[in-house]
Each structure stands twice: as C-alpha cells, then as structure tokens.
Amino acid sequence: MDSGGLREVKEIEIAQLHLRYAHTRIEWPQKVLALANSIERFGQILPVIVLRDGANSFVLIDGYLRVKALKRCLRDTVMAEIWEGKEEEALVEILARANSRKWDLLEEAALLRELHDQYHLSQSRIASMVGRKQSWVSGRLALYSALSEDLLESIRKGAISTWAATRVIAPIARAIPEHAKTLSENLSKEPLSTRELILLFHHYQKANRKQREKIVSAPFLFLKALHAREEATEAKAL
C-alpha cells in the first residue's frame, strides 16, 4: 500500500460503511459517550480511516468508536480518510502506527489473528511488516487463542476488562475451565475493580476446590464477607 502520497479526505454516508472488523474492537461505552459529547460541542475532529471497496462503499479500517459516537449524535455522515489498496495492507499499516494509535492488547491480538488466519500471512511475515519481533506476534496470537469465544465477547462488550481476562480468568481457565466460565459470567453482571480482582485471585489460589467454587460463584459476596471479617478483626485488636 502506497502511504507516501496525500490521501483524499471527504464526508461520506455512514450507510456506505462496511463494519467488517467490528469484531476486533472493544466497544468501550464510556469512551463512546465522551466522544459523542465532544462531537456535539466541537464536531468530528479526526477522520476515520476507510478502504475503498467499490464505487460507493468503504470498509471501515479504524474509527469504530467515532462511528458509534456519530450514530449516537444522530449523524448520517462521517469525515473519512480514504485509502486505496488491499485490506491486509491497511490492517498492517494501522498496527504499525504504534506512536499514533494506542491499541488494547486484545484488539491488537484480534487484528493479528485476522492477518494470520484470514489472509494467511506467516507470523514472521506479520512481524516484519509491523516492525515487531516474531515473539511479539506469537505471544498475542497465543493469548487470543487461550480465551473462549464467550469471554472474548464479554471483553468486546466492555463487560470484562482485558486485564481481568488475561491476568485472572485465563490462568483459572487453564486449570479449571468451568470456574473461569462461572467467574466471567458473574463479572459481566457485577464488575470488580482491578484491586478487588487481585485480592480475589490471591484468595482463589490459596483455596481448596470447594472454597474456589464459592469464590467464583459469588465473587462480590466473597469480598464483602472478607472485608467484614477484616473489620471485625481490627475492631477486636483495639
């Protein structure tokens, strides 16, 4: 893909967009709300990136949150930077823009999976194209493969953070998959802070099988009871 020349930027209809890579993005409801508020006040500041796909249609490459925010503002059009070329080359280019775009770990992994599985690029080829080591590519692909589709969907919906998925749920899944499934379902309904998850995982690792089942079945209640015990112990010490 030739990125040396100037690319056309123009307003296009949102209805002309193919959201082909929506499954590789996290929805981030709070970020969408903040973007919508910004658009209402200042308009769309940065164009999204699209790839021409025929005379009147475009594949959305980057800018999924902006499109969601524009829809929330009841806008019908989006300012877009129009690229020409192959989709895999466009995906490689946005991944290579490490300094201008901060990716979530799972979003990166999902795009690498597209390049590897859908476009049949080898890990070494991908690494060379995005300017990374092969171990960087293989590590992210392995991480993505280790997560169940249900868990990935929870991450995409913003119900579970990438940190919780990779640092807590994935290690549990490697040992006892049903515990990971139960915990992820409960965290989707009642999220915990990073600090609470660290504490929960610490106690889970030390617990026996029966205690672990109780922890994953009711994580919020477990932490509430733990906090109550700690307060009672402190009160006795006074």
Which residues make up each language-model segment?
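Short, charged/polar connector segments at secondary-structure boundaries
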Residues: 1-83
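Short alpha-helical interface patches
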Residues: 2-5, 14-23, 93-97, 149-154, ...
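Amphipathic alpha-helical extensions and coiled-coil-like segments
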Residues: 109-118, 139-238
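Amphipathic, charge-rich alpha-helical segments that serve as recognition/docking helices
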Residues: 24-26, 33, 68-152, 157, ...
